[in-house]
Amino acid sequence: DETPIQVLKEEGRRPQSKSYVWLVRTGDNGGIPIILYNYTPTRAGSHAAAFLAGADPGYYLMVDGYKGYNKVPEAQRCCCWAHIRRYWLRAIPKGHEKDYTHPAVQGFLYCNKLFEYERSYREKGLSLKQIYHRRLKDQKPVIEAFLSWLDQLHPESGDRLIKAINYSNGCRPFMMNYLKDGACSLSNNLSENSIRPLVVGRKNWLFCDTPAGADASMKIYSMIETAKANELDPLKYLSFLLEHRPGAEMSDEELEQFAPWSKLAQ
């Protein structure tokens, strides 16, 4: 996910220029929670590609409909069904929430059915392998029906309805990628929740003075939010780091001892 920030002293840019923070985090599949923030001066998709450089080829990338993510190579892009559902929800006219003949309501219900299945899997405590097989049985037919239904829509009016159709069509190439692995999420909600502390903080600190300050701030955010995600007290974790002072001269194995999920940090 990405969100704008203001950095006052960027070379060759006005103080009012819009800069960006990118967030990348691990999914909710039971692995180690890692949350990383990265400052860049623009929203160009090449920044996302650089941020993710070095990841194993073929990894799954859960994002919204921003086309800049198409520049990320070697990733299997997955679309966020929460974003798609939100477009259909916004397209429902006031007072028509129960009008099941209205296309916006129908589109919303198609999307919502996927989330109902996901909720049932969690309630039943299914394994990732079981989720993979159940998704193919339950959810793939829903998506296929949704796409066939979408092909039949040709509205002549209704800006929000047209936006919902266009947004959904833009996500077509990625709609079923999450079905390939039970560890994939259905939505990008986890990233949106993780970027919220930065958004709330931005309302208080307003801007960063320099690019170096913005970069340092995002490193601090990364440490604090990853510590919180690993159920650590962030103040105690930062004190732990300052006491031990891990440095660049250490090997990767030595540095990992100071990660929030390490036994030493826990």
What are these regions (language model features)?
Residues 2-266:
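Catalytic center-proximal scaffold of phosphoryl-transfer enzymes
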